[in-house]
Amino acid sequence: MPKVALLNQTGSQVGEIELAEAIFGIEPNESVLYDAIVMQQASRRQGTHDTKGRSEVRGGGRKPWKQKGTGRARQGSIRSPQWVGGGTVFGPTPRSYSYKLPKKVRRLALLSALSSKVQNNEIIVLEGLAFDAPKTKDMAAVLNSLSVERKALVVTADYNETIALAARNIPGVTVIDAAGVNVLDLVANDKVIFTKDAVAKVEEVLA
């Protein structure tokens, strides 16, 4: 079983915690990780792009000149695609880019992301995390004591508004609860800070 140091809010070690081998100790599957990241990014696309076809462009209802006798090529509308200002042929239309990988694949990707973080010493486990009031300086002090200098993901057992408000003005810091742990957030952050209770909840959900 992988072991990591158990720290308090001041960054001092107060013990060790054993992580479940089946969740935090597997061999990461990079191919599945890639597929899961692409899936999440695709689902976040707005897909609101739109172009107008010849039937949607304003104007062009009248034939620009008679069919025969002018010496010019026949034309039916000034909004035909070959005209400047005409409609677009097969242009993009609004659509959803989201799709879902099989459940087993998504689970394997999440386990791979968690295990990769453990192997790279990018997981920090806190004995607890609590503030009397949602003050940014308190969260900044905790991150400073943990030597977190870049992007960090803070995972709590349940949604904690005080912690979320304390962290929202700190660039690069994201707070989620254990139920919201996902591959993209894990991979996108340099450090992942779990509370002890959050680890237990993640292990319970993924067991």
UniProtKB/Swiss-Prot annotation:
NCBIfam families: rplD_bact. Belongs to the universal ribosomal protein uL4 family. Residues 43-80 are annotated as: Disordered. HAMAP family: Ribosomal_uL4_B (MF_01328_B). This is Large ribosomal subunit protein uL4. GO terms for biological process: translation. Residues 47-59 have a biased composition (Basic and acidic residues). GO terms for molecular function: rRNA binding; structural constituent of ribosome. Coiled coil: none annotated. One of its GO terms (cellular component) is ribosome. One of the primary rRNA binding proteins, this protein initially binds near the 5'-end of the 23S rRNA. It is important during the early stages of 50S assembly. It makes multiple contacts with different domains of the 23S rRNA in the assembled 50S subunit and ribosome. It comes from the Bacteria. Residues 60-71 have a biased composition (Basic residues). Part of the 50S ribosomal subunit. Signal peptide: none annotated.
